[in-house]
Amino acid sequence: MTHTPVLLKEMLSLLSPQDGGIYVDATFGAGGYSKAILESADCKVYAIDRDETVTKFYDDLSVRYPDRIKLFIEKFSNIKSILSSVEPSPVIPVLDTGKNNWSRAGMTSNGVDGVVFDIGVSSMQLDNGDRGFSFLHDGPLDMSMDNSSYINASTFVNALREEEIANTIYNYGGERHSRKIARAIINARKKKTIKTTFELADIVRSVVFRGKSKIDPATRTFQAIRIWVNDELEELEKGIKAASEILSENGKLIVVTFHSLEDRIVKTFFKDLCATDCKTFSLLNKKVIEASIEEVSANPRSRSAKLRAIQRLS
């Protein structure tokens, strides 16, 4: 499956890239957002992704836009240290202990002009059976986005206690059958180690029946395990907070989410930030932006997408 950037037009309209601007694509993936930003203005993009397999997409863009894009294989929560390591750095730490202790090198304004996030698993990760993200492809139980973590989906199903499994599936997946699923996993692993995505999906389906639902019974369990493996919610909290602290005056922070837990984190953070610091930050869209009927028809993945954005005023 080709990865199609979700809410691309809406993101670009809000970001409004300018010549000479500095932007951060915090979730590079297949490079859809980065490419669109680079095409829109004579600007620079610093791209971040924890998955080293994205380098093939970066290589294409770096040839097309030499000296205008640079990729960092890192967690986006490290955005401050990443940008401070660049020569010349768009943001550098300074000694004052004020609210904003990051400044743009050689310029009067502070920080970067925009940061964009497209949260969650990508199509290329889902479609690669060896990564273990999807029950549609048989593969090892991995699900780690950096493809090298010692904690993976196998750790979750084969090492955690029953209560931990049940609570995680319920809290991160919203699965009301979480206790039955946890018990089934424990019973299965007593007989043999659970090794593949198909094995796990079959275990879930053995106790949760599809009925008339269009959603596979294993969907919520796989989602919950993926979130747990990659510590996605805490990473999101750290990432958007750090991003908000390096915005320039009039800089924009745009976040696209695909899960209610993610959206709640972003909504709450933006609302609180703008309420407590209304002279510094403002909501760009008071009502969440969702994909159009046309986009959902062309790209079903966009059905659950929600876009929220803020702007730094001073």
From Swiss-Prot:
Enzyme Commission (EC) number: 2.1.1.199
An example Gene Ontology CC term for this record: cytoplasm
Top-tier EC class: transferase
Molecular function in Gene Ontology: rRNA (cytosine-N4-)-methyltransferase activity
Pfam family, one: Methyltransf_5
Keywords: Cytoplasm, Methyltransferase, rRNA processing, S-adenosyl-L-methionine, Transferase
Biological process terms in GO annotation: rRNA base methylation
Residues given in the record as S-adenosyl-L-methionine binding sites: 31-33, 49, 76, 118, 125
Catalyzed reactions per annotation: cytidine(1402) in 16S rRNA + S-adenosyl-L-methionine = N(4)-methylcytidine(1402) in 16S rRNA + S-adenosyl-L-homocysteine + H(+)
Function: Specifically methylates the N4 position of cytidine in position 1402 (C1402) of 16S rRNA.
HAMAP family hit by this protein: 16SrRNA_methyltr_H (MF_01007)
Annotated NCBIfam families: 16S rRNA (cytosine(1402)-N(4))-methyltransferase RsmH (TIGR00006)
Family statement drawn from the similarity comment of this UniProt entry: Belongs to the methyltransferase superfamily. RsmH family.
Protein's name in the database: Ribosomal RNA small subunit methyltransferase H
Annotated source species: Wolbachia pipientis wMel
Gene: rsmH
